[in-house]
Amino acid sequence: MEQDKIQHGTTSANNNPVKNNGINLHMFSELSAQFEQYFNKRHFPALPATLYDAAQYLLTVKGKRIRPVMCLMSNELFDQINKDAWHVATAIELFHNFTLVHDDIMDKAPLRRNMPTVHTKYGESTALLAGDVMLVAAYESINKIDSAFIHSVLAIFNETSKKVCEGQQLDIDFEKMSSVSFEDYENMIGLKTSVLLAASMQMGAVLGGAGLGNQQHLYEFGKNLGLAFQVQDDYLDAFGNPEKFGKKTGGDILANKKTFLLIETMNKCSASHKKELMELMQHQHNDDNKIDKVIGIYKSCKVDEWAKELKQKYMAKALMHLDDVAVLSLRKKPLEQLAHYLLDRES
């Protein structure tokens, strides 16, 4: 790939990107700020307030907005970002928050983004309805598309929605199983987490007029980046610095949650380690001793090093597909930098 040079993160006084060789490029931080301003509005009617205030509540608690911004970045690979991409980015964020509301109910989670979850604040019945109207609002946003690509976008969006539900059900099924294969777990994460990143990239490309080959490469870029992102999440929960991670480590261990680390350890460690680990996972007490023992087993089995290698494997595959996208390499630099940032993060 040709090594074009770009001055990253440089903007003019009005926060528009500076032209580099005649090409306008936005970095993630720039588009994230622009999307936040675009998205930060009332998405629902005033009444009944008991329903729509609950739906609006989570949207006002700022998240990373990774998925909608990746849609915009994918769209910009092919030309200036068009208004249809903003509608789809909004739909993606609404859909993502819909899944969070329902996931939190299923997980009985008390907090989301350090704030009470929707069902904790408003009750489970209202939270279910609030999630439902978010999904409806997502489709309303897609219906605002003017271009001839609306049918293609809807097909991708519908298929993605179905896959996310399939992934969530597999996750629920795995909770009842004593062991899960790496392949089955990878498939579940691919459906539950990665597919929305992949679809965000593909829909942005479709709206940019990309051909099927470029669409597929960007889909695979998003999919593998999502898998690498999950490996990093699992790694940080066990081995991260709590001050940088933003919360106490070991949460997945205390919750007996199946992760890449646990799956690999159960499948590859010695019989004695496996027995000890199974006994610990049946231990319901939330204490640091359990966390320390499980992490000790992880280190003995060297799954910390394995996780780093697995993350790099997914990362390399993602970047390979990005490299194969048939646009100027200069245009791909912001996505390449974003990929490295997401996977080198410590929080």
Model-found features: residue ranges?
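All-alpha prenyltransferase/terpene-synthase fold signal
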Residues: M1-S347
